[in-house]
Amino acid sequence: MSQTLTVPTLTLENGTTLRDVPVAYRTWGTLNATGTNAVLVCHALTGDTNVADWWGGLLGPGRALDPTEDFVVCLNVPGSPYGSVAPVTVNPDTGERYGAGFPPFTTRDTVRLHRRALETLGVQRVACAVGGSMGGMHVLEWAFEATDDGAPFVRSLVPIAVGGRHTAWQIGWGAAQRQAIFADPKWRDGTYPPDDPPTNGLATARMMAMVSYRSRPSLDGRFGRDAMPEQDGTPYAVESYLHHHGNKLVDRFDANCYVALTRQMDTHDVARGRGDYAKVLRAIEQPSLVVGIDSDVLYPLSEQEELAEHLPSATLEVLSAPHGHDTFLIELDALNDLVSTWRANICSSVAA
């Protein structure tokens, strides 16, 4: 079950100071006496802290995330509706939900908040940070966190299906999805009541996202031009599939949260304010397993190849599957084999 801790204050990059900031989290395993065996799992856009649910194939004895050896931690990202500070949580200064007034978080704000949370849990250093998509963005930002003596706070990195910065291609996808939400009359500039949210807009945004998360061979191979029964109202099977996923998200997510998180993703750029992009990547010295997907059209393999080219201690592995971007949430056995083998060969030296 998810637990919650409170960070007393947090000042964001834009100067906003928040107080009594909740952070939801789950853990598996036991933190060692030196506080150095933590493995941080960073979740994706609409994910939550329940790693056992969406990455169960990687979690367990003998697997990539081994609670008999690791203190596995997943922290909910601010902006998400699953327990951390977000548009759906109460602003202690007003006694009302943040709603449309939720301040903009950057990926760096998230990492700074999560570091405070980890330190509250007694973590002194993280042995490995692993995550895909939005989670991979946070993994790369963790590379720049240092201890008081200047050593890396996170000793090894596993960014999956992500690049070192959000490109115009990815920003454009998010912008179009947000516009679908804004076009819903129930959006009301984000001030909608909790019992009457812009469900059509959010469902449409999810439908658009699902297309980008798959690949043409995946959708063509699964659905082709198959038709649905007339009474369904959607002529083609792929339409029914997209409507299904749109409606599922509406039942478990919030439109303001979706807007906040996609905007946070757009801030992702490891070189912002740090200098030349290639030089910044070359400064990341931690052992890194970069995982790409050969059918990913949203974060194409060329972006992981670029990361691996510049990260001085990187290993590149490729998941070959037709599913597209979401392969890292589908081909769990293959991903587990890659991560567990790499950790056994490389990361044992950093888990002291």
UniProtKB/Swiss-Prot annotation:
Active-site residue list: 133 (nucleophile), 296, 325
Cellular compartments annotated: Cytoplasm
Main location: cytoplasm
Binding site for substrate: 206, 326
Catalytic activity, EC: 2.3.1.31
Keywords for this protein: Acyltransferase, Amino-acid biosynthesis, Cytoplasm, Methionine biosynthesis, Transferase
GO biological process assignments: homoserine metabolic process; methionine biosynthetic process
Pathway: Amino-acid biosynthesis; L-methionine biosynthesis via de novo pathway; O-acetyl-L-homoserine from L-homoserine: step 1/1
InterPro entries recorded: AB_hydrolase_1, AB_hydrolase_fold, HAT_MetX-like
A molecular-function term among this protein's GO annotations: homoserine O-acetyltransferase activity
Catalytic activity, reaction form: L-homoserine + acetyl-CoA = O-acetyl-L-homoserine + CoA
Domain AB hydrolase-1: 37-330
GO cellular component: cytoplasm
Protein family per UniProt: Belongs to the AB hydrolase superfamily. MetX family.
NCBIfam families: homoserO_Ac_trn, PRK00175.1
Self-association and partners: Homodimer.
Stated role: Transfers an acetyl group from acetyl-CoA to L-homoserine, forming acetyl-L-homoserine.
Name listed for the protein in its UniProt record: Homoserine O-acetyltransferase
Organism of derivation: Salinibacter ruber (strain DSM 13855 / M31)
